[in-house]
A protein has these predicted regions:
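Short runs of predominantly hydrophobic/aromatic residues within well-ordered alpha helices
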Residues: 54-58, 62, 85, 108, ...
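Non-transmembrane, amphipathic alpha-helical segments
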Residues: 18, 22, 46-54, 103-107, ...
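Short, hydrophobic, well-ordered secondary-structure elements
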Residues: 48-73
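Charged alpha-helical initiation segments
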Residues: 1-51
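Charge-enriched, short contiguous segments at helix-coil
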Residues: 98-152
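Histidine-centered active-site/metal-ligand motif
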Residues: 57, 81-83, 124-125
Length: 152
């Protein structure tokens, strides 16, 4: 993810927040997480750890970004046990509020398969590190998925 893409997302997010200060604070957190993906190489020297941190920061940005979207649309799950990527994606494909378009089921499944499963594999499993090929696929997939969600 490059600076240009992050800057574009920042513009989209601030327009989406429409002056709501609480949502703008969340959007700052999302942007900071996405910016940390690029900054990881300056802060972390070990290449395997760099790749792991990229997965961590990109998915934290996505997680908070989906929470922001669902909050703005009045469709955030009420139970804390449902505040995670898998539940957010499920909610997007079955909106309760009717204030946004339904995420098509094949796109929800692709997000589960291409983002959530990889995140869980590497963030929750000791000794596992993604390779460069996965990073080169996963990070753009995360960014593209979030931009898609903002357009629902």
């Amino acid at each position: 993810m490059g600076k240009k893409i992050t800057d574009t997302l920042a513009i989209q997010l601030f327009a989406f927040c429409d002056g709501d200060m609480a949502l703008e604070a969340m959007s700052n957190d999302v942007i900071e997480e996405f910016e940390r993906v690029e900054g990881t190489e300056r802060m972390v020297k070990d290449p395997a750890s760099q790749r792991l941190y990229k997965v961590l920061h990109a998915t934290r940005g996505l997680d908070t970004g989906l929470e922001l979207f669902l909050t703005k649309k009045g469709d955030l799950p009420t139970e804390m046990k449902n505040h995670h990527l898998r539940a957010y994606i499920a909610r997007l494909s079955n909106p309760q509020s009717g204030t946004y378009s339904k995420l098509k089921s094949h796109l929800a499944q692709a997000a589960q398969d291409n983002i959530v499963i990889h995140r869980n594999r590497y963030v929750h499993k000791a000794g596992k590190f993604p390779d460069n090929n996965l990073i080169n696929q996963l990070i753009p997939d995360i960014f593209a998925f979030y931009q898609l969600v903002l357009g629902l």
